[in-house]
Amino acid sequence: MTTKPQKPHILVCNDDGIEGLGLHALAASMKKLGSVTVVAPAEPQSGKSHGMTLGEPLRIRRYQKNNRFFGYTVSGTPVDCIKVALSHILDAKPDLIVSGINYGSNTAMNSLYSGTVAAAREGAIQNVPSLAFSLTTYENADFTYAAKFARQLAREVLRRGMPPDTILSANIPNVPEKEIRGILFTRQGRSRWEESTIERHDMYGNPYYWLAGSLQLHDNDLAEDEYAVRHNYVAVTPITCDMTDHRFRSELETWGLQNTIKK
């Protein structure tokens, strides 16, 4: 008598918060692959990067959608969600962590600010294969194809595995599937967020500030993530937790600083 293979367990998180439509689309798509647990921030946490909450308590709440249990909220950052899920909510490590689907791309230097990418990176730090998904729009979002692609990529990762301390960050154009030109495995580009700071004043005349700006293109190669998505390709970028510049480290050896210490 053969036993049925156990379905994989997938942890779903995001940085847009528990009510984010991309989160709900991603969770629904993952349920076609296995069992799903949703743990997401109680409030939007965009731009929190790898921040975590210290010096104040975290609170976990059960969240219902249409009078049915949907998942858990955590009163903290996306990284807090992963840490709390693995230490207090789940009985065992999941087979996969997926984060998203984010409103707005997380390409190039933008990925450094991203809570969506950070949640996946925390998963990799905790030795769980992890993926991040982002849609290249902030309005009129259609998550249909992004959710479908997320399932395709997740299925392959569940089958093939991932290198340690590495995540995949996928950026998907906000266009119908028929307009997707292909899937490219890209590198992190050099495009970066260029800010403009808006000054305003409260009723007492005290100044306060809003950060604004846009991602400016500094790439011209389909091998770079931002350039690829702007040309309607899905860009999948492997990102490592090791932030060492190994080439420059070798050059530093030639500076001779190590010989200046008198013993």
From Swiss-Prot:
Its EC number is 3.1.3.5. GO terms for molecular function: 3'-nucleotidase activity; 5'-nucleotidase activity; exopolyphosphatase activity; metal ion binding; nucleotide binding. Keywords: Cytoplasm, Hydrolase, Metal-binding, Nucleotide-binding. Its cofactor is a divalent metal cation. InterPro entries: SurE, SurE-like_Pase/nucleotidase, SurE-like_sf. It is an enzyme of class 3 (hydrolase). Binds 1 divalent metal cation per subunit. It catalyses: a ribonucleoside 5'-phosphate + H2O = a ribonucleoside + phosphate. It holds the Pfam family SurE. It is found in: Cytoplasm. One of its GO terms (cellular component) is cytoplasm. A divalent metal cation binds at residues 15-16, 46, 102. Nucleotidase that shows phosphatase activity on nucleoside 5'-monophosphates. Belongs to the SurE nucleotidase family. HAMAP family: SurE. This is 5'-nucleotidase SurE. The lineage of its organism: Bacteria, Pseudomonadati, Chlorobiota, Chlorobiia, Chlorobiales.
